[in-house]
Amino acid sequence: ELKGFMTTNAPGILGQGIKMAQAIGADTVDMDQIQIHPTVQYDSASLITEGLRGDGAILVNTEGKRFIDEVSTRDVVSAAEIAQPGSYSWLIIDQKMVDESSVIQGYIKKGYTFEGKTCEELAEQIGVDGAALAETINTWNGYVEAKNDPDFGRTSFTQALDTAPYYAIKVTAGVHHTMGGLKIDTNTEVLNENGEIIPGLFAAGEVTGGVHGANRLGGTAVSDFVVFGRIAGKAASDYAA
């Protein structure tokens, strides 16, 4: 089912740790649970921070229309994006956002953005209908002013997209995190298929499963590997002593 999906993870992350542990009897959990991130740059597989949507960006499809509450959960936004023509969308931002964000400025330097002095000019750059895109942006700006999105129920209205030039980044959904992995106990000891500890084998971080359930919350992987990493390090040290 994942054939053709890109991933934000490093090329060297291929599940080797899980395979090595399985070779000596380790059990796994939640191996069917993955997290898809909706804003992965279409050509490079680079993660485009969701902070842009929180700061006011919108997503439009190939018709130049919004199709989802952009700040909904990653799985919901990704599913809506995958259902669009071509399974991709355009992340729309304006100059005001660019001026306020070194991150966006970095995206521009990397060549991820298309630019237009007007909504219609940007639409021409990205191959969507100019009138439709202009109407979408104008409508969205009205929603921001009214603090109400009757189309999709978005409740985040940080700022309007009203400062030219306008920019677009082509994004698609990509595998961002795998919730499944080695089954461990609270001391980070890896368990076998009978639920028994495998002596001397400890694991922490994304190689493990059962920590995040079916869908990881943004940012919690950091607390996962920091907390369980420290526990695993101390436990391994105590075991070796």
Question: Model segments located where?
Answer:
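A conserved FAD-binding loop/helix module that cradles the flavin
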Residues: 1-20, 169, 208-240
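Conserved active-site and cofactor/substrate-binding residues in soluble primary-metabolism enzymes
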Residues: 12-19, 54, 87, 113-121, ...
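An anion/pyrophosphate-binding glycine-rich loop and adjacent beta-alpha core
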Residues: 18-132
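Short, ordered coil/turn segments that flank beta-strands lining enzyme active or ligand-binding pockets
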Residues: 62-63, 186, 193, 227
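Gly/Pro-rich active-site capping loops and adjacent beta-alpha segments
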Residues: 66-89, 192, 198-206, 210-222
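A glycine-rich dinucleotide-binding beta-alpha-beta segment and adjacent secondary-structure elements
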Residues: 132-215
